[in-house]
Amino acid sequence: LDLSPALMRELAMVKIALVGLQPDAAGKLPSELSGGMIKRAALARALALDPDIVFLDEPTSGLDPIGAAAFDELIANLRDTLGLTVYMVTHDLDSLVSVCDRIAVLGDKKVLLEGTIDDMLASELPWVKLYFRGPRARMIAPRRGKGA
């Protein structure tokens, strides 16, 4: 792309605002930003060229539960508003439920199961069952029995 510096700055400021950062964040070093702000800045950078697909690797890792929920909401809103396809690698069950409509469970160097959260909850595969219905699956527990 052959964009003028002024247009590049304007587009960057639009993306910064889109992810919920204040304009002054543009002039700050990463060391001056919180963990959540760094993640938002990274998301703004990923959106810079208006992609159709965004790849996210553990986007809520290191965030407190409130920050993680806010980031999940941001991802879902951007997905819906911009028509994005989001591929997300995560171990965060809360994020899976909040953001994902399709899930692929990987193990043993292959896809073990692919489907919706309800498909995961209904699975009798031992590892999938333990992961999605085990002791850490508190948020998705209310979904058990709903379509599963």
Model-derived segments and spans:
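A short, proline-enriched helix->beta-strand linker immediately N-terminal to the Walker B motif
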Residues: 48-52
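A short, surface-exposed alpha-helical micro-motif characterized by mixed small hydrophobic
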Residues: 96-98
